[in-house]
Swiss-Prot record:
Swiss-Prot/TrEMBL keywords: Antibiotic, Antimicrobial, Secreted
Function: Antibacterial protein.
Keyword Secreted: yes
Pfam families hit by this protein: Gloverin (PF10793)
Organism classification: Eukaryota, Metazoa, Ecdysozoa, Arthropoda, Hexapoda
Protein's UniProt name: Gloverin
Length: 36
């Protein structure tokens, strides 16, 4: 799910996911999204 969404909309979804997951456990996910 993450790979698909990130690959499709890296700009829109990446930002949204980063913000949402930053509160739960996006520190790692956020960094991965930023790098990708």
């Amino acid at each position: 799910v993450f790979g698909t969404l990130g690959s499709t909309d890296d700009s829109l979804f990446g930002r949204y996911k980063q913000d949402i997951f930053n509160d739960h456990r996006g520190h790692l996910q956020g960094q991965a999204y930023g790098s990708r």
